Each structure stands twice: as structure tokens, then as C-alpha cells.
């Protein structure tokens, strides 16, 4: 399958939103019950890197980073968001997208990437492991689902982390 990975632009938001909504609908991608508006999403994610993967000109997936803390000492520590549209899952797009995000993050001086993943999302856990993330532990009953068939249920989250061998090594 031919695809291209490039920086996300505000004009991509409608398609990014659609992919995000597909992830939400699985019940195993996020605690979010709905896609936030552009302004809220934009303000909660780093300006760079933000990536989209396009197949035949349409957004098939996206990845972005957000800060884990406003404290200066954690300036290079981020949380990963990565979503692939359902028709494109299992075809290597997530693999290429996460590799590109890691590369871009290291160029931006990010030294640690974290991911919080529901234990049921085995494909995401395996994808992150493939790219050097390790399991730090399980955050037990960290939040309650507010929607879907798991509404009202406490959920565990697998906390994973990748420490760069390039950025922040001084």
C-alpha cells in the first residue's frame, strides 16, 4: 500500500477527527467520549511533531504528542497519541507512523515518550514494544468509562515508556 507521512495541518482536522472518532468507538483507545473541537485539541498537543499518514490523498491515521507536565524539568517528556483508521489497521501504517513520530520527536529534543494503553488493546501494546517502549506497570482502575458498553466500569491502563538514545543524553 502506498502512503505518505507528512506534518498535520489545521485543514486536516475534519479527517483527523473522523479517525479519532473511530478509535473512540472501539472503547479501547481512550477515555474520551467524544472528539474535542480543534481549539481544545490544538492547545493540548505540542505544535510539532504532529503527523498524518495519507493513503490516496485521505488521512488514514495520525500521531501527536502532548506534555505530561508543565514543569520545566519535564520539558522533554511527552505522551503519545496515535490512531489509525479501521480500514488501514494491520497494514503497517501504525508502524511507519510511530517510527516517524519517534524520529521527529528526537529531532525536536524529546527524550522520553510515554503511552497509556488499555490492556485489551494488544495491537497497540505490541506496536509500542516493537519501537522500544517498555511496560513500566499497570495503573489500576485509573479512570471510569463514561460511554459505551463499558460505561461505569473502572479501567486499568498499561503505562509504557521509551527513552531516547539520541535526545537528552548529555
Over which residues does each language-model region extend?
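Conserved GNAT acetyl-CoA-binding A-motif
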Residues: 105-117
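A short beta-loop-alpha structural element at the N-terminal edge
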Residues: 2-16
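Glycine-rich acetyl-CoA-binding "A-motif" of GNAT/NAT acetyltransferases
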Residues: 58-62, 123, 154
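Conserved GNAT-fold acetyl-CoA-binding loop/helix
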Residues: 13, 17-43
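Acetyl-CoA-dependent GNAT
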Residues: 33-87, 98-99, 104, 163-165
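C-terminal "cap" of GNAT-fold acetyltransferases
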Residues: 141-170
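Conserved acetyl-CoA-binding loop-helix of GNAT-fold acetyltransferases
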Residues: 90-103, 126-130
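Conserved catalytic-core motifs of GNAT/GCN5-like acyltransferases
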Residues: 64, 114-117, 125, 129, ...
